[in-house]
Amino acid sequence: MNLEKINKLIKAEYAFFLQQKKGWSLTAGPQDLELVAHALRVLLHARTTPDFLADYLALVDCQGKDGGWSPFSADRESTVWVSAFCGLMLIRGNRLLHHERLTRSVRKAIDYFLDAQQSDGRWVDPRWADLDTTSHPVSFFNVVMALDEPHRRHDVLQAWERGARFILDRQSADGGWYDNDFHPSGVEITAHLIQDALVADLVIDHCLSGVRESCAKGAVKLYEWQAADGSWDEENVDHTMDCTRSLMVVTRILGDERGEDIIVRGLHWIIANKNLQGWGDFPGMETNLERTCDGLDTLLKYKAYRSIDPRDVVKLWGYIP
């Protein structure tokens, strides 16, 4: 894959992303916070976070009293999945911004997730499968530990381990994870779990037994699920981006070179099926901002994946400072 072409695409799509700022920035008014978190991730990986402090502070402003966030910024009922995504963007963004309000917000979010965890280690959210929901606070806690955030460190470690073990114990024998109500195909949830929840342990502290084997089995299942044209899940743009990004970080950490061709095929398909500007949910569908953020994130991560230093792509998950 030609990196010059990738860089040109990144430049063009980032310009389009900025043109659409009113659609994702809290400084422009109330927003869908899942989209806001996607946008803040683009800023992180485009290395422009310091130019957008107001957006991070606006996210702090809509944090609930319980430490969580609601799916829509003007609402007040916190839910786990979006709260973890918001908290993750704040702790990663604050490495560059060094702002006391962000520090306090992250610590409130830690309290929220510690209070919300169920007795069996899972977290729940009515909008998401329990496994997918659980992977998000686990991912947040991965970064909390990687960045040496001291707030309630012992409690965080215990909650993280219980959440990760909940996920590990529910992997199917074929290497995938499934949920009949939310993820019957297993594609998206498997891609999420190995990159967001599990593989970080191999970088941070190797606390959990079975993680390497679990991630390797999950990656092989993603290889098997890829269609001949390079897509996943019946030409689902979102899930194809998820799988392509997941394999970038997982195969780098595992040292598995078999993923290279799979990743390149996925990226070729993603680029071939973009709109003039941005991406839709399926080929030929109208561009939407969330998918465009995912597309930009995929391109930016591929650029890091191609770096000589294998740690560069891992840094874009926050698992290495």
Roles of regions detected by a PLM:
Residues 1-13, 304-321:
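Intrinsic N-terminal pre-sequences and regulatory tails
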Residues 10-17, 59-60, 113-114, 167, ...:
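Buried hydrophobic core positions in alpha-solenoid tandem helical repeats
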Residues 63, 69, 87-90, 117, ...:
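Fold-core signature of tandem repeat domains
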Residues 268-270, 311:
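Compact disulfide-stabilized, cysteine-rich extracellular microdomains and processed peptide cores
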Residues 1-2, 26-54, 71-104, 108, ...:
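An alpha-helical repeat/solenoid feature that recognizes helix-turn-helix modules
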